[in-house]
């Protein structure tokens, strides 16, 4: 969840808890084919060490439930395996990007065959 930002006088907030995979707004805007990205596929929840971890896991579980519901409406789903990554660890972003790229390439290869 990112800090809200103001752009052109409007306050924009992270939609991760509500609209993590915005399939419905895309359909409403006229999209006929929607590719969703499921960043919660195969997630392992870490054993909580303190109350902050408990709340963090609760938020992760809520986000994952919303994501599953929304990705079911997509026509195609890219689902990189991110079980070894934490949503809160920003130091591994290059690895996450590479994993997403790899997953997308694999999906495209399947579609071509």
Regions found by a protein language model. Give the residues of each.
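Patatin-like phospholipase
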Residues: 1-113
């Amino acid at each position: 969840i990112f800090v809200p930002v103001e752009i052109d006088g409007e306050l924009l907030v992270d939609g991760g808890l509500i609209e993590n995979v915005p399939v419905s707004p895309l359909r409403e805007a006229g999209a006929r084919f929607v590719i969703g990205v499921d960043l919660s596929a195969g997630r392992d929840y870490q054993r909580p060490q303190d109350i902050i971890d408990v709340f963090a896991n609760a938020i992760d579980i809520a986000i994952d439930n919303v994501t599953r519901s929304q990705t079911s409406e997509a026509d195609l789903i890219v689902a990189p395996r991110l079980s070894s990554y934490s949503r809160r660890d920003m130091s591994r972003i290059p690895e996450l990007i590479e994993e997403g790229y790899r997953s997308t390439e694999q999906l495209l290869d399947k579609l071509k065959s």
